[in-house]
Curated annotation (Swiss-Prot):
Membrane topology: Lipid-anchor
InterPro entries, A to Z: Mycoplasma_peptidase_DUF31, Peptidase_S1_PA, Uncharacterised_MG067
Location in the cell: Cell membrane
Protein name in the entry: Uncharacterized lipoprotein MPN_592
Family: Belongs to the MG067/MG068/MG395 family.
Organism: Mycoplasma pneumoniae (strain ATCC 29342 / M129 / Subtype 1)
Amino acid sequence: MGFKLKGFGFLTLFASQAFLTACSATLTVANTNHKNESDKFVIFEPQPPLSQTIPKPEAEPVIEPDAVATPPVQNAEVQIKPDSSKGVYSPGFKFNTNFIPKVNTKYRPGYDLSFALKFGTSWKEAYGTGWLIDWKDVKQDNKFTAYLATNLHVADSLRNKDDYKPYNKDGNQKEFLPGDITTEFSLGKYIDAQTVQKLTPEYQNLKHLNNRNSDALVSIQTSKLPKTAYTATDFIKTAQYKYNHIVSNTVYELDLFQNAVSYADFAVLELELNLANNRDQQIFDSFINPAVTAYEKLGNSLGLFSNLQLDQYVDDTHYLLGYPLLKREKTSYWNLPQKGYSSPLYENSNKEVSRITRNIRKDDEIPGSRLVQNQINYLPFAQNDPKGVMDFSKYLNYVFNYHEKQYQHHGYGLLLEDTDFPGGSSGSPLFNQNKQINSIYFAALPSKSYGVSQILRATQNKDKSKNYDLIFGDSNTKKYYAQFAKEHKTHLYHQILQSNDEQFRFVENDQTVTSQTPFKS
């Protein structure tokens, strides 16, 4: 995500020199020169006094071409348009940006499903990446409900008083602080010039806006704030993490989760679009509907997610695409607010935007990432872990505060060679060479240029006591997304009903109350 997160022991893995940096980003509105670059799961958010009034001009699209009018092209018939699928490389940044992948290529699934997320309060913006995981099939009058997967630490930026319980209050069930309440939400995507023109017809006669003829990052404000559909908090049965520890012939019980509730860095947001609203209709037509089509072609809900033995991930190539917050440079950018909406004036918006990025590097241009195979040299307690896999439950100070409630990281992650994406990329889906999602990107280990992702389904782990499935559930997972999907009759649940495969049908026999609180009572 893209802001500096609050004071975590998240950064240090015991005595090792490994520092995990959460890939999110935050900008303060009042002090735009103080941007938290890539956050280190140490959130530092300088809050201005709430009494300060930030100028809020009447809403107009923030249009940021590279900014001078261009003279007419003389021999236009011989102009050859650059191949937008190749992208560009910027000085000082090794990854490929500003591209639209060709159909049927390895990065196309990530492009089709993924979006730039922006959360705004009265004094700051937070950025992350999200992707379409589900939607409601049932036709609703002038409504469409989409579900976007992202990281838990990205979803932490949503403080919506009208959210589902218990997410409408903090983790101690207290009201959110006024300055933390989310006031606006935008969905963005890097799109081709033709779609840019379709979304900005009212500006077609403004000749100086030459970026209407360019591929661009377009961010559109929604008419309503999202709600929280699912958080991977208190998601695992932890009884098996109690051990007898013998010291001087005395037996002590060691409970790894004695002082904190488990979490995985995964969440799902519900976004209801009002199709009678022009901006929401634009989001549906240009962002969500194409994603639905791509999702179905990728194998739909039951074919989209991989489910491997932990020692098999090392054989795969992993493709990452997300929207880190980077210097704008030659990136055309449109910010389309709701009609009549007064939004803060972001002075820094001409310097940094969410730029589409993939793990192709300037020095070799070999697509994708392989897993680290010698993590024992950098991480303690990794002796028995499969190559490239990290067992988060071994690192007791790897904790996170979601809505002011502390949780301890659990589950398994992938350690990716040379994949240290900056803030704003948190929440990006990681695809394998078979175009299946295996995990969700959430952090970087900058000292080694490693990226880290959270495995979503670990049901075939040979250590059966540590199985989990954040999507479809299993006997060791007490809180998973399919519970919400069943309760709300979503597309993913309808897909489950059509399957006879037991790996997807656990929710049908699960008697767990789906509206359970994620907070320990």
